[in-house]
Amino acid sequence: MFMNLLSQVSNAIFPQVEAAQKMSNRAVAVLRGDVVSGTIWITQNSESDPAVIEGEIKGLTPGLHGFHVHQYGDSTNGCLSAGPHFNPFGKTHGGPNSETRHVGDLGNVEAGADGVAKVHITDKLITLYGANTVIGRSMVVHAGQDDLGQGVGDKAEESAKTGNAGARAACGVIALAAPQ
């Protein structure tokens, strides 16, 4: 009886989720931190197309800042609750153009002297569709530069996990956006 009920609930809910994903090819993350804030839009025209990630982040120190999709859309303990980089294939950390990388590894964004980073990234691993969708996960901008998995010496071990990008300056849950 329980399994029958579970099956009925599942059959009622999941088609609605799939339908919502098919209706919108856009997602949005509103980033919030103590000083840093921003809005990031992700657009993907079809499952086979690359995702386009665009937006603006304010309040950063001038220079490069690690920019990643993290595993969880959880902010109960600030950005720490977002967990590690989104890595469904169990790879080591890398840059956005590396052959080996986490799905969530988007490299760095660069803030100008005004503390603003204009984001425009096209990525072939980020997806709004299927089992590895980034919807419901977190977008995180870090306080420091991502070394793209190229750290050496005493920095090599952490580089393979996080890119040594430092503290999480701001984060936001990636949510379905209204269709345009």
Curated annotation (Swiss-Prot):
Kindly state what the record says about how the cofactor is bound: Binds 1 copper ion per subunit.
Give the required cofactors: Cu cation; Zn(2+)
What's the catalysed reaction? Answer: 2 superoxide + 2 H(+) = H2O2 + O2
One Gene Ontology term from the biological process aspect of the record: superoxide metabolic process
Residues the record lists as binding Cu cation: 68, 70, 85, 142
Q: According to its UniProt record, what is one Pfam family this protein matches?
A: Sod_Cu
Instruction: Explain the purpose of this protein.
Output: Destroys radicals which are normally produced within the cells and which are toxic to biological systems. Required for normal brood size. May be involved in regulating mpk-1 phosphorylation downstream of phosphatase ptp-2 during oocyte maturation.
> What PANTHER family is this protein classified in?
SUPEROXIDE DISMUTASE CU-ZN -RELATED
Complex formation: Homodimer.
Indicate what this protein is called per its UniProt record: Superoxide dismutase [Cu-Zn]
Q: Which organism is it from?
A: Caenorhabditis briggsae
